[in-house]
Amino acid sequence: MVAQLYHHLTILIASIYIIFFVNAAPTLYEDDEEDFNSTEYDVFLDSDSFQFPRRNSSCNCTREEATRTLLEALKRALQIIAGYINETDTEELPTYPPTMTTPLETTPLDTSPPVLPSAIP
């Protein structure tokens, strides 16, 4: 269940990244003579709008529309995640081996002072 939650959070973060950074980025062409002061780049830099939902589309949406779309996507993602959290697990908890009831047999520690080899007759 936790793995599913992390999976959905990862998808959510990746989606947000794609929506706001990949789709809003200016289209870079392989032509070295491309003018980076084009209107597409200016639209990206404009604080009131950015390209949404496709990079090459000519329609732009305002920040309010983008925020509304993002909030709807977040709401839907949170509903999906909440559905997983609220599910009751019918699985039983795993059983572990019982604790040892009898101590292991051990030899008592020898606490007598050491006998020096010169003291042995």
Curated annotation (Swiss-Prot):
It is found in: Host membrane. GO terms for cellular component: host cell membrane; membrane. Residues 98-113 have a biased composition (Low complexity). This is Uncharacterized gene A4 protein. It is a single-pass membrane protein. Coiled coil: none annotated. The chain crosses the membrane at residues 9-29.
